């Protein structure tokens, strides 16, 4: 059975959301790169592997029941204390285009359920992410 590291699982979450609407935009790709390079959770991740990990996720998503398989790998790899981080990363990628597609909303909700994040906690994370992306 395939397994992934917690770093890969977090990257999978971002790739899954970016690919949800069928188009991985330049803003989404740029955001993934910036987040991986700057967040403390990725401090000991070899950033030269980012493209390879993203491609691995894409391959999993292409399989039958790919979304379920990818999210299963994510859920198995993430310790409980990183599930909220994963959810926030999903929101960051969805918001990076300044618009959130319906497909992305569905995938984010699926991620929330798969990671066992309570609705109230999810709402707080969502509000924080939305506030971060507000413009005047």
How would you label these PLM feature ranges?
Residues 1-136:
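Small-residue-enriched hydrophobic alpha-helices in membranes
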């Amino acid at each position: 059975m395939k397994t992934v590291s917690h770093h890969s699982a977090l990257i999978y979450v971002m790739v899954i959301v970016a690919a949800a609407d069928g188009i991985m935009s330049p803003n989404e790709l740029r955001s993934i790169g910036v987040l991986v390079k700057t967040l403390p959770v990725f401090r000991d991740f070899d950033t030269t592997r980012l493209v390879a990990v993203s491609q691995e996720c894409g391959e999993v998503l292409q399989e039958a029941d790919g979304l379920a398989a990818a999210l299963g790998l994510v859920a198995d790899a993430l310790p409980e204390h990183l599930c909220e981080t994963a959810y926030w990363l999903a929101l960051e990628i969805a918001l990076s285009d300044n618009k959130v597609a319906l497909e992305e909303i569905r995938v984010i909700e699926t991620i929330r359920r798969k990671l066992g994040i309570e609705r109230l906690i999810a709402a707080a994370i969502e509000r924080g992410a939305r506030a971060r992306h507000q413009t005047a």
